[in-house]
Amino acid sequence: MSLPTMDKPVRQLFGTDGIRGVAGEYPLDPHTVFAIGRALGARLVEKYQTARVLIGQDTRESSDWISRALARGLESANCGVASAGVITTPGVAYLTRTHGFSAGIVVSASHNPWTDNGIKVFGANGYKLSDDIEHEIEAQIFYHLEELERAESEGEGPAMLPGDDKLREDYAEWLRSQVEGTDFSKFRVLLDCANGAASSIAHLVFPKVGVFSEFTHICPTGRNINANCGALHPEEAAKHVGQSRGRFDLGITFDGDADRALFSDGDGNIVNGDAVLLLAARDMKARGHLKEDTVVATTMSNMGLEAALKRSGIRMLRAAVGDKYVLEEMKKTGATLGGEQSGHILFMDSDATTGDGILTALRVLEVLARSGKSLAELIADLKVFPQVIRNVKVNAKIPMKELPAVMSAIEAAEQDLGDSGRVVVRYSGTEKLARVMIEAESEAKMNQHATAIAEAIQEAIGI
């Protein structure tokens, strides 16, 4: 089978969570980033006439120049620009919809390495753009790329965009208001900010609502975001909590842009997004906040979560991976709670428009305070099916159905496992990876089939 070369730029910029890539390389080279800003600015000026865009960023060393290039592109289309500086992704979403901005842009690659970066766009309502709108913007970006002179895109601009501290404080105040009146004085929490965007916000929230907070990984260098810390490595905080001999009630870890959170209980056991969905769903149902008695999870959520929710009279629906797609399903069904195993949780009863790691942490603490129980006690009946995830680096994202050996391995696994397991094989929307996820009652069969499928992918399109 001949495979398409990856040397030439592919005209497909947006993945499941905006545009991502290696900073400095297409599509995150200065020329293309400028064109992205110009295309978005032109679209907004046509729609709003006097358009203003809010830009926020994480702590990667490339985030400054990408923000500047975007700002120059926007301003070249006569679109106004404001900056929130280093701030979380959900912070930009909140401020965009509450402060009258025409759109919000986040410069971040979330959990990716520091060498990567990305661009996420929110509409004036604080929601991520639909796939259809992203496709329209792509066409405009390529038009501007062809029209622009490279010298214009690489012109001079400010050394950095000054961030507005008032904007960050407004967002922090909203977060605090979500748990107003709750007594958190008995909680002692370890917070891992991943040397990322949470470093600029978390200290404005947790201590001020009464949580005894110890912060770690809050000294970003531009190159240490997500490095052996945060939600990408929750075992680090979990180990610290477990060895603290009761000093901490739980650990909380954020990823680079703090749109998700993972936890560890007082014994140092890692608690993922599935468990958070379970405890939040039960609490919301008891208070009459769980509309339709429904939770929206994804294809990656464990079968054990579905069983535990069913025992509580709660229906679970599965959406495609990506909090954007979870939100779409929530809107369709009227659900007020949804999320991913990775820790993206959406609380529609808090009027949130995207996953928010800090809000999730506050809501979990609120459930603990309300119930008087520990995190471990609240999720004790969650019996997780054995699950394995294998990541395979690929040189091209060929549709699986066009890879006969891979399809044969998948079909063999599905036939062997039957109703006692699940097989999900998909490409990452943000990296050049194929992900193989298998759940099964039999760990031996699970690992056997995961290895067979991963090897078939590696042989067909692996790097």
From Swiss-Prot:
CDD domains for this protein: GlmM (cd05802)
Pfam families: PGM_PMM_I, PGM_PMM_II, PGM_PMM_III, PGM_PMM_IV
Record's comment on post-translational modification: Activated by phosphorylation.
Residues at the active site: 110 (phosphoserine intermediate)
Substrates-to-products reaction catalysed: alpha-D-glucosamine 1-phosphate = D-glucosamine 6-phosphate
Cofactors, names only: Mg(2+)
GO CC annotations on file: cytosol
Binding site for Mg(2+): 110, 255, 257, 259
GO MF term list: magnesium ion binding; phosphoglucosamine mutase activity; phosphomannomutase activity
Domain of life: Bacteria
Disulfide bonds: none
Biological role stated in the UniProt entry: Catalyzes the conversion of glucosamine-6-phosphate to glucosamine-1-phosphate.
HAMAP family: GlmM_B
PANTHER family: PHOSPHOGLUCOMUTASE (ALPHA-D-GLUCOSE-1,6-BISPHOSPHATE-DEPENDENT), PHOSPHOHEXOSE MUTASE
The protein, known as: Phosphoglucosamine mutase
Source species: Koribacter versatilis (strain Ellin345)
